[in-house]
Structures are given as structure tokens and as C-alpha cells.
Amino acid sequence: MSEEQILNTHNASILLSAANKSHYPQDDLPEIALAGRSNVGKSSFINTILGRKSLARTSSKPGKTQLLNFFNVDDKLRLVDVPGYGYAKVSKAERARWGKMIEEYLTTRQNLRAVVSLVDFRHESSQDDIQMYEFLKYYEIPVIIVATKADKVPRGRWNKHESMVKKSLNFDQTDAFIIFSSVERIGIDESWDTILEYL
């Protein structure tokens, strides 16, 4: 795989968790952030592209990621898992705190190169997904759309679902759109090829 010539994707570890910028790593390593609704499969995405079973903790209970989690990949790149949005069982105050933390990171972090915005391939994008996409476009932050859980959609319906998701997002055709499945290991190489374009 081309990405392995550039970085050893299996040489990865969780570096730290941060609540605000005073806790961020203090160097110039490039970062790719991962954003998406609770339970869209962010942890599974991280584990799958890094070839690890449980580096990022997966949970059947949405809303488990409450801090910015920084993952070091081969000392050349960091993946940053931000708290999942759209989880109803969190208090308004807690949701507001998460929102502020995410916004501060996305709008002020010099290391940030692009955001992988994960959406559920089975459904139209939620209002939260649309707001996140519009936010990233407004701030001119490069965005990669990764449509997860593709194994739950029959292949004969993929074109229809891709069109549905893109239409609901008002998708910019210049952005990358990757169909992904952790279960069937679909979209791993394409995800890395796209991420590496931003380093």
C-alpha cells in the first residue's frame, strides 16, 4: 500500500486527551480531525485504518468520547477524535461545552490539515451532519466525507444512497467522498490516499 511507504500506519498509539488548547500537543505535526454523530463509527474507523482492534475504544453507548483524543501515527501524523455530536442523553450544558471545545480546536489549531466528516451511508444526512459540513465549508477547512456502515446497504443501492447523502449535504463535488465499511474493510486505502494528500 502506498501509505505504508510514507508512514507505518500500524505504529500508532493514543497520545493524550485534551479539554482545551492548553492541553494540545506543542509541536508542528500535521493533524487530521475526525468528526461525526455519536455512534456513526468514528472509533471503528480509527481502529480499521490503523489495523488495530481496540486502540480507539468502541462503545454501544453513544457519547462516550468527551475530550479531544490525539492519536500518534508513526510520529508523522496525528488523528484527532472529537466528541460525537447529536447525542440526546447529554445535558444542554454539556453539549454546549463540547461544541465550544470542538469549535475552538477546528478554528484555531494551526496543525489541522483537514477534517474527516463521518456520515451514516444508510440514511440522509442529519441536521447535525449538515451543520458540521456547512461549518467546515464556511471556515474553509478541507473536508473529506466518509460514509460509514456501507456493509448495511446492498451494493446495488450504493449509487442511490451516495446521491441521497450528497444531496442532503448539498455536497461540494470538489470534496472527497469515500464509501467505507469497517466490517468489510472497504475504503481503507482510499481513506489513506486522500488523507495523505493533505500532509
UniProtKB/Swiss-Prot annotation:
GO cellular component terms, semicolon-separated: cytosol
Domain EngB-type G: 28-199
Cofactor requirement: Mg(2+)
Annotated keywords: Cell cycle, Cell division, GTP-binding, Magnesium, Metal-binding, Nucleotide-binding, Septation
InterPro entries tied to this protein: G_ENGB_dom (IPR030393), GTP-bd (IPR006073), GTP-bd_ribosome_bio_YsxC (IPR019987), P-loop_NTPase (IPR027417)
Presence of the UniProt keyword Cell cycle in the record: yes
KW Transmembrane (keyword) present: no
GO BP, one annotated term: division septum assembly
Residues holding Mg(2+): 43, 65
Binding positions for GTP per the UniProt entry: 36-43, 63-67, 81-84, 148-151, 180-182
MF terms (GO), sorted A to Z: GTP binding; metal ion binding
Task of the protein: Necessary for normal cell division and for the maintenance of normal septation.
Family of the protein in this entry: Belongs to the TRAFAC class TrmE-Era-EngA-EngB-Septin-like GTPase superfamily. EngB GTPase family.
UniProt protein name: Probable GTP-binding protein EngB
Native species: Streptococcus equi subsp. equi (strain 4047)
Phylogenetic lineage: Bacteria, Bacillati, Bacillota, Bacilli, Lactobacillales
